[in-house]
Structure formats: C-alpha cells, structure tokens
C-alpha cells in the first residue's frame, strides 16, 4: 500500500452576456451570434440567438479571450454599426458583456439635371414622394434618423430639393422597402 497525493483544482467559470440593440423599431429577437474561443473553436451552443429582450447569456465559460461575431443574413435590411467581430475577456466569477447595435440600411436617390446638350442645370426643383402600397402617396419629410417617409437631406422643404450649381441633388437616408 502506497500513499498518493492528489491535488484538485477548483476552476471558477465566467459568463458572457451579449446585448443586441436595434435603432428604430426593429425586433430584438432572433439575431444570430457565433462565439469562438482563443483557438477559433466555436463554443457549445454557438451560434446563439437573442431573446425577445435582445440578450444572450452563455453557459459557464473558462476564463480567457472569446470572439463574438454577429451573423447577418445576406441581403439583410440591417447593418451592424458596432465593431464586428468583437473580442472580449471572460474573467472567472464575472459576467463579461459585449454590445452590438444595428441600424436599418438606408438608400439614396441622386438626380442630375441636364439639358439636351448635357449642360448641367442648377436651380431645378424636384419633389420626392413615398408610399408603402403604391396607392397612397405623400412627400418625404425631414428626419435625421431612418424612418418611413423620412429623408435627411439638407434643404428639404415639403418633400422638395433644388439642384446645386452642378445640377445635382441627393435625397438621402431613405427607408428601404418603400415605393419612391
């Protein structure tokens, strides 16, 4: 009979909280995130989907560096405004947090006014109207944020812009999926 010394080490785990925010009226549920460890291996449960409140809380993780990447579907109407991917340090006994903010991917309409000889014409006024169904139309209104029927172009008045000295104008920050 021989004595043997055995050492047990208690490892205290940490957790990772991913917080999803969407500018405007977008849903917080169902956004997909891949989480990998320092070796590039996906952790159990990855990819994760955000809940109704936009949060994900992972199971216990070993302390160390993890990479969190938002997985946006191809052709998504949203764009990630945060760094993507992001690296975060999980510390034992603590919950590391990382946030991702998305915004609607807006569009723009550029107009260049020229005459028959291709000379650019300044001072021409254009009205831009929008509709959700193609039946009821209304002028775009000034808005600094992306909203249905909004436009952030400087000088917009009653849905109208006037071409500059180069005969150009841009209706910008237009909400996608509408008729213009």
Residue ranges and their predicted role:
Residues 1-180:
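Solvent-exposed loop/turn and edge beta-strand elements of beta-rich ligand-binding domains
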């Amino acid at each position: 009979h021989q004595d043997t010394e055995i050492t047990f080490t208690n490892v205290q785990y940490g957790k990772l909280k991913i917080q999803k925010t969407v500018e405007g009226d977008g849903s917080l549920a169902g956004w997909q995130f891949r989480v990998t460890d320092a070796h590039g291996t996906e952790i159990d449960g990855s990819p994760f989907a955000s809940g109704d409140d936009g949060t994900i809380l992972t199971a216990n993780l070993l302390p160390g560096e993890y990479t969190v990447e938002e997985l946006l579907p191809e052709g998504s109407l949203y764009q990630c405004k945060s760094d993507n991917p992001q690296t975060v340090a999980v510390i034992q006994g603590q919950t590391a947090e990382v946030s991702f903010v998305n915004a609607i991917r807006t569009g723009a309409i550029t107009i260049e006014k020229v005459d028959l000889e291709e000379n650019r014409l300044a001072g021409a006024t254009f009205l831009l109207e929008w509709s959700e169904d193609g039946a009821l139309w209304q002028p775009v209104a000034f808005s600094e944020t992306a909203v249905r029927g909004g436009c952030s172009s400087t000088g917009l008045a009653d849905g109208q812009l006037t071409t500059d000295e180069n005969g150009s104008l841009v209706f910008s920050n237009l909400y996608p999926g509408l008729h213009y």
